[in-house]
Amino acid sequence: MKKTNPKATKTVYPIICQIVNVIPHQFIAEAAKAHKVLSRTFTPKSHVAAMLYCQVSKTESLNSICDVAAANEALWTSMGVTVPRRNTFSNANAMRPSAMAKDLYWRTYNYLIGIAPDFGRRAHRGYCSRVKAPMFAVDSSTIKLTMNSFDWARHRREKAAAKLHMTLDLGNRLPSFAVVEDAAHHDSVRAAELTAHLRRGDIAVADRAYTDFGFMNGLDARGVWFVTRQKRNMKMEVVRRLMEPAAATGERKTQILADEIVVPAKKSTAAKYAGTLRRVTAVVEVQGQMKTMMFLTNNLKWSARTVAEIYRDRWGIETFFKELKQTCQIHDFIGYSENAVQWQVWIGLLAHLILRYLRYLSKWGLSFSRLAALVRGTLWNRRRLIETLRLYGTASPVKSPARKPKPLYFQAVFDFPSAAVGQQTP
């Protein structure tokens, strides 16, 4: 079947409008009312639309957003919003509570999960499918800022940064909880808050920054399984060996070196975690290199290889952070206050969620960065977005029809002799 490029038509809204319309209109009004956002001309919907355009187009300044909106005023106002003015837009980012953007994100998240259950249940390639319990990765990502402009985010003598703490559902690779704040606090400070919503039987996976005996004891008391890495300075006493120690073979696959039951060796740490832990030592591949790692868990029934593979799935949250920063505007900020930064990060998460949902609807088969680039390049086109994504994302490149060789008219007109130069033809 021949695929044709979807034609532009006046009856279809521009693609930026179709992206904004993924969010039910009443959600913006309800979130604004819940957080007492007052407005006259620059409505909350106008604010959200401008911020979504900033994220999807990766625009770096307020002036650029306002200029593009003014240049495309007829298309911009077709969304039912007003063209932003620089000062009004800047004041909205600084004064309107960022809790509205956070609230809007979770309203939209729950709505999309509700209307498309498969979108919320989809497991990615490499997921440890033999583990049926829900798995959640806990981690944070640092967002570098300029100390001269973002003095509220100063956390070292000459550095400033914000931090995005997150609990990611490893099944669908979508956030289940997130916190945006300055980077002055250690990751472990937010550990209990990030895992408060986990239920009995869920699995929490975290790196060494969250390895704390008090935190692990709280998870164990609630019936939550955990897999984390042992810190280098942790002193553990071996109670029982579940397998004899082995040596690494040099093969490029997960190798189990030791499987032990351990307890904290110091009295001070033993008071924080009174139970026993299981320590699995394995050689795993990290960024193309084989490394030896020690994992701690409170589950004694899983196989040692399953423990290592569960921790391997934790790297899905690293992929999420990389994907978010590559496709959304999380590097350059259009506002300097803490509230403005939080607005931009939460709308960045919202834009990422919408793009992920569009990828699900269109059955996009290429990389996520290519989808974001295609959407970015067609924001003002009047084309049906899903049809456009299906054309470019699911099919192999269309082969051009084979061309018939053209007749050699030059040779037909002039009958060249076949004999060599200087010879006479018979």
Task: Please place each PLM-identified region on the residue numbering.
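Long amphipathic N-terminal alpha/beta scaffold segment
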Residues: 113-129, 145
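Catalytic micro-motifs at enzyme active sites that drive phosphoryl/nucleotidyl and oxygen chemistry
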Residues: 77-78, 122-126, 152-156, 215
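Major-groove recognition helix of helix-turn-helix-like DNA-binding domains
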Residues: 78-96
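Short acidic (Asp/Glu) patches
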Residues: 74-75, 118-121, 148-154, 185, ...
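Extended, structured, electrostatic nucleic-acid-contact surfaces
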Residues: 70-79
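Short Lys/Arg-enriched helix C-cap and helix-to-coil transition segments
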Residues: 100-116
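Single, function-defining residue in the core of a domain
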Residues: 1-64, 68, 96, 103-107, ...
